Structure formats: structure tokens, C-alpha cells
């Protein structure tokens, strides 16, 4: 079995994590929002997408690990996908600060 890390459990990351979990992978999902983590751990959908409401794994589901800590998750993962927001700035350029922060956190958590 392979372990997949998903950094960012929003409208892209959460369904991606669920899809990999349903395919048999162990999931290490990470989000900076404690509220999001608490909801996903409770089997609830924090995204607002009604298509996800009935597919979030229930509490205690095997191979489903959800945390706010990238440092906790990454050492368990064979691959890490970053699915964080890239909002548009006032001058219509992508704000990559979330991607950069997630990338740094993943890099720092990789076992040396």
C-alpha cells in the first residue's frame, strides 16, 4: 500500500483525498484550518460542495488521517500533492504565497 499526502483540504484537495482513499491508498490530509480538520475528522464536508456531503469518510475510518501538521503527515507519505488556494491579486496575478508556504513546510518535513 502507498501513502498519499494531500496538503489543503478544500474543494480540490478533499475530493482528491477521498478518491485516493476509495482507491485503496492511505491518506494523510493536512489543512491549516483547525475548523476544516475538525469537520473532516467528524465526517463532515467543510467545502460547501453538495456533491461531497455524502462521501467524506466517517470518523475512525482506516487509512484516513487528518491533521493540521505537515510535519506530522509528510514522513508517512510516499507522495504529497499540494492543493492550496492561488487567489488572484488586485493586479490580476496569481498569489502563490500559499503554494510557497506549503512547499516550504513539505520540504522541511521530509525525513533527512
Question: What residue spans do the PLM features occupy?
Answer:
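Structural/interface elements that position substrates and couple domains in central-metabolism enzymes
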Residues: 1-112
Amino acid at each position: 500500500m502507498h501513502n498519499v499526502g494531500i496538503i489543503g483540504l478544500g474543494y480540490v484537495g478533499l475530493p482528491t483525498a477521498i478518491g485516493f482513499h476509495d482507491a485503496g491508498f492511505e491518506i494523510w490530509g493536512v489543512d491549516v484550518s483547525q475548523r476544516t480538520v475538525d469537520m473532516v475528522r467528524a465526517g463532515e464536508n467543510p467545502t460547501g460542495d453538495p456533491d461531497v456531503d455524502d462521501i467524506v469518510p466517517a470518523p475512525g475510518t482506516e487509512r484516513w488521517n487528518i491533521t493540521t501538521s505537515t510535519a506530522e503527515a509528510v514522513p508517512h507519505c510516499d507522495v504529497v500533492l499540494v492543493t492550496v488556494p492561488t487567489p488572484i491579486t488586485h493586479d490580476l496575478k496569481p498569489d502563490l504565497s500559499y503554494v510557497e508556504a506549503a512547499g516550504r513546510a513539505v520540504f522541511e518535513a521530509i525525513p533527512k
